[in-house]
Amino acid sequence: MGLQALSGVAKDLTKMSAKSAVKLVVAEDEDATLFKWVAILTGSKNTLKGVGFFLGGALLTWLGYEVALYGMAGAVALSFVAVLLLMTGDLGKAKEKVKFSVILTKSPAINILSGARFFLFGARDIWFVVGLPLFLASQLNWNHTQIGSYMAAWVIGYGLVQSISPQIANHNANAGSARLWLLALIVLTGVMSGSIYLDFQPALTVLTGLIIFGFIFALNSSIHSYLILVYSDRDKVALNVGFYYMANAGGRLAGTLISGLAYQFGGILFCLLTALGFLIASWLIALALPHSDTGLIPRKQENSG
């Protein structure tokens, strides 16, 4: 368990560093290019995560646990060597040390976006992490393989949507579009809750609703990932992104814990209603995001980048 925890910390540090680097290698006035590469990086990461579910199962089946671990360690070692050879050592290094408290006192936009992110990801995991698998097993009689395959396929699709989110969102990523897609999630989750409460095709509601939820959620997540870079100074981008992902991790932890409790109290319906509350909280926080032209990306600019 300790090694698993350290692995998770290393993964988040790698994710934070990679997204911070995008801000540093893209010119400051190339908003469309920044959105495009953030979307590609975020989407490919989640798509590979979904593929990893399938590969993990295959490696366990074909090679066994110990050999599978050696194989993964070898792949990570090759990546480490590539980073040492190809990446400059001063990329993203701050000019001066910054105290943690500075983020809270001098970055209101980042604080607000991080708060919205906390409740957004908490809302997803409240019904996705524990409630959904239990619903599929107890109500639809799915086995472990079916549940794992469905959720892995969902993660892959989610990542693919993130990768092309600039085209889907018409190259429009700003605080207003973030609030709009959040509102769409609120409406969808409310409709799903009502359908299940009325016992109207609950299985179809959950399976179809999850696909639509993933599509909208992927767009919202990509816009958030873009906005955190827009709101960050180049010199402190890694620090700001790290704080933002701390909120992301906190939301996921809260969502995971609440998911099991909510399902025990009232099944998938109570999970959805609790998620709905988190989405509303995220939307209310997002109302305070700065109103500006930042993030309005002309379509023609993307082609020139």
Where are these regions (language model features)?
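Symmetry-related core transmembrane helices of the 12-TM Major Facilitator Superfamily/SLC fold
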Residues: 67-85, 270-288
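Cytoplasmic helix-loop-helix junction between adjacent transmembrane helices
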Residues: 2-45
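Helix-to-loop junctions at the C-terminal end of transmembrane segments
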Residues: 60, 160-177, 263
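Short amphipathic helix-loop junctions that connect adjacent transmembrane helices
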Residues: 130-147
